[in-house]
Amino acid sequence: IVLKDLLGYDSTFAGAMIGLILAILVGIIIIGGIKRIASVTEKVVPFMALLYIIACLYIIGSNFSFIDDAFKLIITEAFNPTAIGVGSIMSVLMIGFQRAAFSNEAGAGSASIAHSAVKTKYAASEGLVALLEPFIDTVVICTMTALVIIIFNFSGAFMYGGEGGVMIDGVLYEGAGITAKAFDQYIPGSEYFLTTAVVLFAVSTMISWSYYGIQSWKYLFGKGKVADMVYKLMFLAFIVIGSAASMNSIWAFSDAMIFAMVFPNMIGLYFLFPVVKEQLNKYLKVIKEAKV
């Protein structure tokens, strides 16, 4: 869907074709198993994140004088009396929590599937590593993106064009399209880089979630080559279906599914809290003794 916006296509057929290409690419990778998944993601994810961060830092650094005003605008607009009066704060918080959960999976219990595959002597050490993911993903990368867009708008670049979109030069932009326009203003031709980054983000995310899904599938239906292949074909089919669907439908479905994971996971975390505490204390004790 994001690729449709970035490439300028606006049809179900175009989305399905993009989804088909992605499905073929992801299919080649996931049929190779977890070793190939690890080898692909460990190279792709750091590379794309580094490129994106460098581009953001360049834009922010080139307009460093606007940083104070940008943060001031974020804080004042979030808590101004008008927003409080119309209940906008609650709406923003709800959307913020939804998008944060969507971007970093915090509380969904999905990341633990990948981290549990890591061979480590102490489970708590891997848990601490996992804590870095939401910070880097949401606090660092998302904040940088927001600053780039806000700095771009200080020149009066766009106006509000309805729910989820803004008007730039008479054209309605949504989602990644706004980011692409902001990047292109300061780094000409960067929309192609951003399109590449989105592809890499999307492919790596689909690869990771395919692994989460196959582990859940095995738990429910048992291990077997036929069962595994059925799941993988279903997963690839939904890549095409999702690419052809509308953005609103995808957000609604994703929010519902994430809530369906978060609710039982929170209950599980509550009952497993004593175990987590025990493992953490054991790990901290080892670290303390090592320092002594």
Q: How should each PLM-predicted stretch be described?
A:
Residues L7-G32, L51, L194-T196, K225-S243:
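Transmembrane alpha-helical segments of multi-pass small-molecule transport proteins
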Residues T195-V240, V275-V292:
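C-terminal membrane-solvent junction of multi-pass transporters and transport-like membrane proteins
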Residues I1, G15-A23, G27, I59-F64, ...:
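Hydrophobic, membrane-embedded alpha-helices of multi-pass small-molecule transporters
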Residues I18-I21, L51, A83-S103, V140-C142, ...:
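Select transmembrane alpha-helical segments in multipass membrane proteins
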Residues F13-S62, I67, F71-I75, W217, ...:
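Membrane-interface loop-to-helix entry segments
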Residues I1-G19, D69-M90, S155-Y186, K223, ...:
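Inter-helical loop and helix-membrane interface segments of multi-pass membrane transporters/permeases
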Residues F13-A14, T120-I136, K223-K232:
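Membrane-interface alpha-helices at helix entry/exit sites of multi-pass transporters
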Residues A55-L73, A117-V118, L132, I136-G175:
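Extracellular/periplasmic helix-exit of transmembrane alpha-helices
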